[in-house]
Amino acid sequence: MVPISMAPDRGANSLVSLRFTTFAVSTVCLPLFAFLFCIVWSLLFNFSETTETHCHVPNYLPSVSAAIGGETPQRYLWRLCIGLHSAPRFLVAMAYLKYYQGTPCSNPYYPRLCHINFLLNSCEIFFLMLLTYVSSSENHEVHKLGFMSFMFFSLGYMFVTCTLWRMTRKWSGSPEERTSYAWKKRLFGFYLLMFLASIVVYIWHNMYCEPGVYTLFAFLEYLVVLSNMAFHMTAWWDFGNKELMICSPGDKRI
C-alpha cells in the first residue's frame, strides 16, 4: 500500500535498509525521551524555578513550557531532539499521504481529505518547532501562538486521520489495521478530553489561584503530550513489513 516497498530480497545495490515501523516509532521516541528527561531534571534540580506561579501559590509540577524551555540543560536537549526528529517526521507524513492514496475508497471527498491530512500533519510539525525554538521566557506571544496553532492542527490531524480510516473501513481489515484504528480513536478521544480539561483547570487557576490547581493543570498537560506521541506511534501497526531503503541508481525500486 505504501510506495516504500520491501523487495523479496535485499539486492547488492541496496545501501541502507531499515524497517519503516522502526524508523517511524524511533522518530517519536526522540521527543518522548527529551520530554521525560526535562520533567525529571526540572523536578530534581530546578524545582523552585520551574514550579513558580504568578500568584505564588504552592505548585508541585512544572508546566510543559517551564520544563522544556525555562532552564538549561533541559532547553538544549529538547531543542536538539525536536530538531533531529523533525525532518524524519515530514518523511513519515509523506509516507502516510502515499499510504492513504494507495487505499481504495469510493467517497468523492477522500482524495481531498488525504491532502488536507498531510497539510495538517505538516503544520503540526512546523508549529511544534516554533513553540520549541521560541520559549515562553524569550517571546511569550510567539510561543503562545505556536502552542495554540500546534494544538489546533494536531486535533485536526487526529480527527481527519480517524475519518480517513472510517471511510476506508479499516475496522474490517487486517488485525493490525483494526488494532491501529481502535487505538487511534481511543487516543484522539483521550487527547481531546485532556485538552479540554486542562483549559478548564487553567482558567480555574487564573481566577482563584488555589494551591495545587496548577499542579493538576501541569499533569493534564503531560497527558496531552503523551497521548499525542502515542497517537503517532500507531504507525507501528500501519506500515507492517515496509522498509525504508536507500539504493544505488541501478536498483529499480520505488
Swiss-Prot record:
<feature type="transmembrane region" description="Helical">
    <location>
        <begin position="187"/>
        <end position="207"/>
    </location>
</feature>
<keyword id="KW-0812">Transmembrane</keyword>
<dbReference type="Pfam" id="PF10277">
    <property type="entry name" value="Frag1"/>
</dbReference>
<feature type="transmembrane region" description="Helical">
    <location>
        <begin position="25"/>
        <end position="45"/>
    </location>
</feature>
<feature type="transmembrane region" description="Helical">
    <location>
        <begin position="211"/>
        <end position="231"/>
    </location>
</feature>
<feature type="transmembrane region" description="Helical">
    <location>
        <begin position="114"/>
        <end position="134"/>
    </location>
</feature>
<feature type="topological domain" description="Cytoplasmic">
    <location>
        <begin position="208"/>
        <end position="210"/>
    </location>
</feature>
<feature type="topological domain" description="Lumenal">
    <location>
        <begin position="232"/>
        <end position="254"/>
    </location>
</feature>
<keyword id="KW-0337">GPI-anchor biosynthesis</keyword>
<keyword id="KW-0808">Transferase</keyword>
<keyword id="KW-0472">Membrane</keyword>
<feature type="topological domain" description="Lumenal">
    <location>
        <begin position="46"/>
        <end position="113"/>
    </location>
</feature>
<feature type="transmembrane region" description="Helical">
    <location>
        <begin position="145"/>
        <end position="165"/>
    </location>
</feature>
<protein>
    <recommendedName>
        <fullName>Acyltransferase PGAP2</fullName>
        <ecNumber>2.3.-.-</ecNumber>
    </recommendedName>
</protein>
<comment type="function">
    <text>Involved in the fatty acid remodeling steps of GPI-anchor maturation where the unsaturated acyl chain at sn-2 of inositol phosphate is replaced by a saturated stearoyl chain. May catalyze the second step of the fatty acid remodeling, by reacylating a lyso-GPI intermediate at sn-2 of inositol phosphate by a saturated chain. The fatty acid remodeling steps is critical for the integration of GPI-APs into lipid rafts.</text>
</comment>
<feature type="topological domain" description="Lumenal">
    <location>
        <begin position="166"/>
        <end position="186"/>
    </location>
</feature>
<dbReference type="GO" id="GO:0000139">
    <property type="term" value="C:Golgi membrane"/>
</dbReference>
<dbReference type="GO" id="GO:0005789">
    <property type="term" value="C:endoplasmic reticulum membrane"/>
</dbReference>
<comment type="similarity">
    <text>Belongs to the PGAP2 family.</text>
</comment>
<keyword id="KW-0333">Golgi apparatus</keyword>
<feature type="topological domain" description="Cytoplasmic">
    <location>
        <begin position="135"/>
        <end position="144"/>
    </location>
</feature>
<dbReference type="InterPro" id="IPR039545">
    <property type="entry name" value="PGAP2"/>
</dbReference>
<dbReference type="InterPro" id="IPR019402">
    <property type="entry name" value="Frag1/DRAM/Sfk1"/>
</dbReference>
<keyword id="KW-1133">Transmembrane helix</keyword>
<feature type="topological domain" description="Cytoplasmic">
    <location>
        <begin position="1"/>
        <end position="24"/>
    </location>
</feature>
<dbReference type="GO" id="GO:0006506">
    <property type="term" value="P:GPI anchor biosynthetic process"/>
</dbReference>
